[in-house]
């Protein structure tokens, strides 16, 4: 009996049910990765996915961006059905692409089309980093090239928002060829006096930053966007020097003359409209 008195009582933890864990439906709230503020996702969307507390620019999907910029009902998508054929039969590539299609409701990492912005007609391309990290494969390169050719044909400006991890490794040299292909198409646009506005968003890296994204008549970026070719760690190991904390940010590139302006998302449409107005030929 004395032994029972001194023995430890078993303690039991209450494990919350699965239902309790999901009292708040997924996607209702979003936490800012910069200041950790938690906000309603629908309020964040109303604010163009910019944090009210610290101004952090969250990633924006392609159709939300198009909706925020173009006049309602004017957008007509181009080449929607184009999909990759896995030219190198790369292991698990088809499965990963199919998974991204289901997750994003996109066929590829870019949406291209035509529309008007405050009445000014243009051709637009918007990359979406949710699909294979926005990587550039043969379909992405082809869609950009066709959009540029449409701008040439219609004598309209071409506006492109970049968001990419670079060339798509699963397509090998075919993805690298898109750097030259898109750059050559932009040269043809320039030759006929066409306007190309490039807006780099987070992230714009690798072969995309080294080709069409940096070839605009105007090169803009969103605040805090990561923009560069090789990764920070690789550069530091190569030059054996420590790089500044703001290296490869939009602000760093602006300071060193590689961008024309860093534009907050709330000012993007007005700024682009002014440029379209300046270059508009009636």
From Swiss-Prot:
Q: What class of enzyme is it?
A: transferase
Q: Which reaction(s) does the protein catalyse, per the Swiss-Prot or TrEMBL entry?
A: N(6)-carboxybiotinyl-L-lysyl-[protein] + acetyl-CoA = N(6)-biotinyl-L-lysyl-[protein] + malonyl-CoA
Organism superkingdom: Bacteria
ZnF (C4-type) intervals:
32-54
Q: Supply the InterPro entries for this chain.
A: AcCoA_carboxyl_beta (IPR034733), Acetyl_CoA_COase_Trfase_b_su (IPR000438), ClpP/crotonase-like_dom_sf (IPR029045), COA_CT_N (IPR011762), Znf-ACC (IPR041010)
- CoA carboxyltransferase N-terminal domain span: 28-282
EC assignment: the record states 2.1.3.15
Query: Any idea which positions bind Zn(2+)?
Result: 32, 35, 51, 54
Q: Which Pfam families match?
A: Carboxyl_trans, Zn_ribbon_ACC
Q: How is the cofactor bound?
A: Binds 1 zinc ion per subunit.
- Localisation: Cytoplasm
State the needed cofactors, names only. Answer: Zn(2+)
| GO biological process terms held by the UniProt record | fatty acid biosynthetic process; malonyl-CoA biosynthetic process
> Cellular component GO terms, alphabetically?
acetyl-CoA carboxylase complex
Q: Which family does it belong to?
A: Belongs to the AccD/PCCB family.
Outline the subunit composition: Acetyl-CoA carboxylase is a heterohexamer composed of biotin carboxyl carrier protein (AccB), biotin carboxylase (AccC) and two subunits each of ACCase subunit alpha (AccA) and ACCase subunit beta (AccD).
Q: What is this protein called?
A: Acetyl-coenzyme A carboxylase carboxyl transferase subunit beta
């Amino acid at each position: 009996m004395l032994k029972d008195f001194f023995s430890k009582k078993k303690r039991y933890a209450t494990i919350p049910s699965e239902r309790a864990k999901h009292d708040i439906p997924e996607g209702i709230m979003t936490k800012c990765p910069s200041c950790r503020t938690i906000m309603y996702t629908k309020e964040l969307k109303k604010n163009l996915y910019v944090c009210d507390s610290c101004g952090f620019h969250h990633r924006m999907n392609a159709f939300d961006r198009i909706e925020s910029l173009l006049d309602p009902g004017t957008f007509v998508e181009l080449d929607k059905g184009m999909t990759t054929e896995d030219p190198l039969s790369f292991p698990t590539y088809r499965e990963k692409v199919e998974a991204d299609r289901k997750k994003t409701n996109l066929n590829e990492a870019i949406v291209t089309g035509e529309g008007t912005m405050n009445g000014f007609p243009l051709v637009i391309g918007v990359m979406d980093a949710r699909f294979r990290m926005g990587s550039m494969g043969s379909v992405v390169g082809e869609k950009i090239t066709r959009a540029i050719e449409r701008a040439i044909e219609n004598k309209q400006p071409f506006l492109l928002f970049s968001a990419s991890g670079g060339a798509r490794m699963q397509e090998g040299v075919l993805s690298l060829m898109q750097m030259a292909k898109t750059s050559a198409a932009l040269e043809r646009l320039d030759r006929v006096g066409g306007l190309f506005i490039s807006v780099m968003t987070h992230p714009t890296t690798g072969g995309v930053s080294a080709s069409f994204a940096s070839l605009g008549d105007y090169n803009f970026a969103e605040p805090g966007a990561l923009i560069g070719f090789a990764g920070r760690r690789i550069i530091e190991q190569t030059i054996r020097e420590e790089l500044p904390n703001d290296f490869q940010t939009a602000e760093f590139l602006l300071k060193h003359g590689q961008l024309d302006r860093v534009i907050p998302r709330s000012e993007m449409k007005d700024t682009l409209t002014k440029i379209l107005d300046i270059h508009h030929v009636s």
